[in-house]
């Protein structure tokens, strides 16, 4: 069996500054989402728009630490007042797979969805998973993301990168192999 080539069709990323999320989320939606989730959905939608793709076959995300701010808020409330006081939103948003799940819910995507949480190897693992599935012919497109927030106690920094991988060379920026080093440096 020969492997199919894999191409990068679009990349979207955010620096430390946030865009105007009101363009994408209603006030009610925005209140229920932490900053990390807003940034993840934002870059994912922008990458898909840039790629001219409405729905990927798979969503694969990587996060070094997940939403540490939500985890800290949940555990702090639990410590302060026992199990009666924590906000459920803080707990739900503290799990690492919440990022990929929310992107899938927002898009209505019912395909393959996986999250990698391996500290410095998370994004590489997510890219490898998507590359393998496309090159083997299991899927044709994948939305791959790397999302983290600045949290001093663990030395993490803001990351919001979304990449659309595809089996089709049409509209591609280049091959996966040619651009891999650039992606991992972002």
Please identify what each model-predicted range represents.
Residues 1-112, 117, 121-125, 132-139, ...:
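Conserved "HGTGT" condensation-loop signature of ketosynthase/thiolase-family condensing enzymes
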């Amino acid at each position: 069996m020969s492997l199919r080539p894999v191409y990068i069709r679009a990349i979207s990323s955010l620096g430390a500054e946030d865009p105007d999320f009101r363009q994408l989320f209603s006030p009610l939606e925005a209140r229920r989402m932490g900053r990390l989730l807003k940034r993840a959905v934002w870059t994912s939608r922008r990458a898909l728009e840039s790629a001219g793709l409405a729905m990927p076959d798979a969503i694969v995300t990587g996060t070094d630490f997940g939403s540490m701010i939500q985890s800290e808020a949940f555990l702090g409330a639990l410590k302060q007042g026992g199990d009666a006081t924590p906000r459920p939103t803080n707990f739900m948003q503290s799990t690492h797979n919440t990022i990929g799940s929310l992107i899938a819910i927002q898009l209505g995507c019912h395909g393959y969805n996986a999250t990698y949480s391996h500290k410095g190897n998370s994004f590489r693992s997510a890219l490898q998973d998507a590359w393998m599935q496309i090159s083997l012919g299991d899927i044709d497109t994948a939305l791959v993301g790397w999302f983290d927030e600045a949290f001093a106690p663990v030395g993490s920094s803001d990351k919001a990168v979304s990449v659309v991988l595809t089996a089709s060379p049409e509209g591609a920026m280049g091959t996966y192999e040619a651009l891999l080093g650039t992606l991992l440096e972002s």
